[in-house]
Amino acid sequence: FKPSASDFSLSADSIGNRWLQEPVVRPNGFPLYHWIQTERGEGLLTLEGQELLLKPGDGVLIAPHVPHEYRENDGSGMWFTSFLTFDGKLSDDLYKICAVSPYLFVPASEGAWFQEWIDRIIDSHFLKNDIDDATLSVGCFEFLTRLSQLRTGLSRTEHPLYLQYVRPAMQEIESHLSD
């Protein structure tokens, strides 16, 4: 689904799961940071002259405007993915958060959390209709902080970005839940 546009510092521009992935060729890349993760099947991602095999659970965050292409790779014709693109006032500064240039690969051993996050957000939107723009924005910071944590080794709640952005936002949301 495509969440509503907002004035938040960070939000999801598009998000999806259980997506039967068609071949994609982007000679000029994509204009936003783009997460893609294999749910089922196997994909082949080509970027910067490198081929990355995306097995179930593997995911990758691709920086904006990085030429890339991806397609199903295991011969089944059935490559299912989840995806997330980021937008908002801080979207151009995500390289500072994730230190991604031009991509960050996440192996299946670390990927389950990201899949569960996407499933949870989609479930909250479609089945419960209980996610608002503020909650989605906080969730996007959480998602990116978790990615950044893979590079730094800090726990999620110790990460400086969590302390600076997520904790205050969560406190603000919690203080207004009864409103």
Regions found by a protein language model. Give the residues of each.
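A short, N-terminal "cap"/entry segment at the start of jelly-roll beta-barrel domains
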Residues: 1-11, 105, 124-127, 131, ...
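N-terminal regulatory/effector-sensing and dimerization cores
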Residues: 7-101, 133
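Amphipathic, well-ordered alpha-helical segments in soluble domains
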Residues: 11, 34-37, 90, 113-117, ...
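Aromatic/histidine-rich interaction motifs
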Residues: 96-119
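N-terminal positioning helix adjacent to the helix-turn-helix/winged-helix DNA-binding module
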Residues: 110-113, 161-169
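Basic, amphipathic alpha-helical hairpins
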Residues: 120-131, 144-156, 168-179
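Short, solvent-exposed positions on alpha-helices
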Residues: 130-138
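Polybasic "coupling" helices that flank or enter modular domains
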Residues: 138-141, 156-164
